[in-house]
Structure formats: structure tokens, C-alpha cells
């Protein structure tokens, strides 16, 4: 929509522009100051400036357009091209509620399909058929390598006592076309109420859960094997007490028992007591340095108060020292004792 706006001055006019021939975009109003002159003239962000005071702005550079606007006399006449505003009935480019509802339903279907793609497929090892499915009737034999060890371990007499949640399982067997061994297939699990009322014990074999009666031979055999594999556990304190009692019964020397059975108290005294840290000795006063020490050379240390010039007694901590023979001097007195100053050896 083309319109003309007269902004009453003087400058500043209260708006900003962007674009230009150097940016390959038309000159556009990007910001209008609140309660400013441009806002009073109904200038809005997004308006495209076609001409400035009658001069076409199509081929103007950005800096050129800025200069013409700033130097323009009052009033500033701008010919604008204002884009049409979206109607209130439009939302996200759609003009009706029916189209929006259709898009919402399609998005829900897409979300459902994505969740369904994550569910196990019939060829997946995690796929299980429902109890009422005609593809897996009760008592059907399924050949699986994970059940073969359990199928070989069950004898005909003990397999009759196999229960699943308190219900006797079917004992049908057959061979698959691939030649796998037949295994026992159980009926689907009962309701939670029936499962809680039945007395059973869960036994894990090859990663699959089965239920056996407590008076069956298979349960007793598995229980004996489990108890045989379990190693006896004994606490360290009880073991020490047992060794002490056995040594006393044999008439030997009683074993050493720590008072609080703590590992620290059982250590020898020579190891428990740490040796005191080695202290440096000040070479000037020949006393031990307990706190801070100043290292002059390898194996030579002094107190901070003893680190002074041998002539004037000036502290050399922030100045550094100079060697003259075997004494430390400040720079002033070291130069007085040297005939050749370039041979000074300064150590900070």
C-alpha cells in the first residue's frame, strides 16, 4: 500500500533505516522511537521508503539515504510502500480453523506412527503375541535356543509338576523345521489376584523366568546346587576372634587383638608415628628455620630477617643480593667493593 508521510522536524526524526543499494535490499524503516516525531506522523517499522523529498531512493546507498534524511528540512516527506497486515483470522499462514485442525490431526498421526515404529516387530526377539491372538494359541510349541537348556534338564516325571502362576502348563512338544529341540510352552500368565494367591518360587534359567513347586525334584536339585555354589561368609572381626581362641586352646601365644578392631591400631608404633619434618638451618645465625625460609643457593637458607646486606643491614628481600666473596651486599655497597662493575653477578 503506497502512502505519503510528512514528518515535522527538525531533526532528529526518531526512526532508523536499513538496506540500500550496497546491501541489495530496499531502504526500510526498522525502528520507530516511542512518542517521537516519526511515530506522530504514523511511520511504522517495516515501511519501505520509495522516495525522500521527491527523490527516488531505489538507487541510493545506505549512507546516502541517511545523509539526505538527516539534512532534510522540515517537514521530511517520505513516500512509503507499506505491506498489508495479516488479518486476525489468519494463524501461521492458515486462513481457517478447518485447515488448522487438519494440520493438527496430521501431526498427531505422524507422532503416533513414530511411536509405533519403535515398538517390537514380529521378527524381533522382544515381540510377544497377546493371549487372545489366533497366531499363538494356548499350548503352542515355540522353539527357541534360549529355552533349550531348560528343556534338556526337565525329565518327563518332573515336567508334569511345572506350573506358571499356579496353573499347570501344557506339555506338547514338536520339532521346528530348522531342527531345534522341542521345549515346554506355558499358558499366558493369570490375573494379578490369582498370581498373588498362589505359592511359588521364581527360578531364573538362561535369562527366562519359570515357576516350580517347592516339593518337586527339580526345585530340590536347583536348591542344592545353589547352596553348594554359595561360599560361606565370615566377617574379619569374627575371624580374628576365632584365630585367637584357637591359638589359646592349643596353648600357644594368644593372637594380637586390636582394641577397637580398627586397621590403624594394628599398625606398629614405628609406622604409626610419622617422623618430624626436616627443618632448614639459617647459615647466618645457625638456628633452625621453623616458618618461612629464604633460599639463597642450593642447601643455603636464611631467615627473612637475616637476609640483609653485610655492610648496611638493609633487607634484601625485595631488592636482591650481590655476592662479594662469600658475603651478601646490596647493589650500592657491592659496587663500592668491585673494581670492575660489569663483573657483578646479580641474583634476585
UniProtKB/Swiss-Prot annotation:
Q: Which SUPFAM superfamilies match?
A: Glucocorticoid receptor-like (DNA-binding domain), PDZ domain-like
Example GO molecular function: ubiquitin protein ligase binding
**What segment(s) does the record annotate as region Disordered?**
67-139, 165-202, 249-275
The LIM zinc-binding domain sits at 280-340
What are the entry keywords?
A: Cytoplasm, Cytoskeleton, LIM domain, Metal-binding, Phosphoprotein, Zinc
Q: Which residues carry this modification: Phosphoserine?
A: 117, 119, 124, 133, 153, 191, 197-198, 202, 209, 262
Say where the protein is mainly found.
cytoplasm
Has UniProt tagged this entry with the keyword NADP? no
Q: Name the residue ranges with Low complexity bias.
A: 193-202, 257-270
PDZ domain location: 1-84
For this protein, the record's PANTHER family field holds: PDZ AND LIM DOMAIN PROTEIN 2, PDZ AND LIM DOMAIN PROTEIN ZASP
Q: What does this protein do?
A: Probable adapter protein located at the actin cytoskeleton that promotes cell attachment. Necessary for the migratory capacity of epithelial cells. Overexpression enhances cell adhesion to collagen and fibronectin and suppresses anchorage independent growth. May contribute to tumor cell migratory capacity.
Q: Could you tell me what this protein is called?
A: PDZ and LIM domain protein 2
> Gene that codes for this?
PDLIM2
Amino acid at each position: 500500500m503506497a502512502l505519503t508521510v510528512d514528518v515535522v522536524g527538525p531533526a532528529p526524526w526518531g526512526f532508523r533505516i536499513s538496506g540500500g543499494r550496497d546491501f541489495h535490499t530496499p531502504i526500510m524503516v526498522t525502528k520507530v522511537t516511542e512518542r517521537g516525531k516519526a511515530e506522530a506522523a504514523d511511520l511504522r517499522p517495516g515501511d519501505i521508503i520509495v522516495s525522500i523529498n521527491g527523490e527516488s531512493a531505489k538507487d541510493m546507498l545506505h549512507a546516502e539515504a541517511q545523509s539526505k534524511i538527516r539534512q532534510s528540512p522540515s517537514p521530511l516527506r517520505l513516500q512509503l510502500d507499506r505491506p498489508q497486515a495479516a488479518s486476525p483470522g489468519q494463524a501461521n499462514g492458515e486462513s481457517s480453523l478447518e485447515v488448522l485442525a487438519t494440520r493438527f490431526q496430521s501431526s498427531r498421526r505422524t507422532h503416533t506412527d513414530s511411536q509405533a515404529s519403535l515398538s517390537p516387530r514380529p521378527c524381533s526377539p522382544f515381540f510377544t503375541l497377546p493371549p487372545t491372538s489366533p497366531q499363538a494359541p494356548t499350548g503352542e510349541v515355540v522353539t527357541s535356543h534360549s529355552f533349550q537348556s531348560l528343556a534338556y534338564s526337565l525329565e518327563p516325571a518332573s515336567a508334569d509338576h511345572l506350573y506358571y502362576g499356579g496353573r499347570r502348563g501344557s506339555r506338547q512338544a514338536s520339532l521346528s523345521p530348522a531342527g531345534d529341540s522341542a521345549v515346554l510352552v506355558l499358558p499366558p500368565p493369570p490375573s494379578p489376584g490369582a498370581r498373588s494367591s498362589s505359592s511359588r518360587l521364581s527360578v531364573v534359567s538362561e535369562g527366562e523366568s519359570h515357576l516350580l513347586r517347592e516339593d518337586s525334584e527339580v526345585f530340590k536339585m536347583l536348591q542344592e546346587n545353589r547352596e553348594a555354589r554359595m561360599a560361606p561368609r565370615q566377617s574379619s572381626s569374627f575371624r580374628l576372634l576365632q584365630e585367637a581362641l584357637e591359638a589359646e586352646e592349643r596353648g600357644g601365644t594368644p593372637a594380637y587383638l586390636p582394641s577397637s578392631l580398627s586397621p590403624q591400631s594394628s599398625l606398629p608404633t614405628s609406622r604409626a608415628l610419622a617422623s618430624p619434618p626436616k627443618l632448614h638451618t639459617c647459615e647466618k645465625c645457625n638456628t633452625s628455620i621453623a616458618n618461612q625460609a629464604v633460599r639463597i643457593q642450593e642447601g643455603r637458607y636464611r631467615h627473612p630477617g637475616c637476609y640483609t646486606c653485610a655492610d648496611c643491614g638493609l633487607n634484601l628481600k625485595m631488592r636482591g643480593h650481590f655476592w662479594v666473596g662469600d658475603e651478601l651486599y646490596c647493589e650500592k655497597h657491592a659496587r663500592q667493593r668491585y673494581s670492575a662493575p660489569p663483573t657483578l653477578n646479580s641474583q634476585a
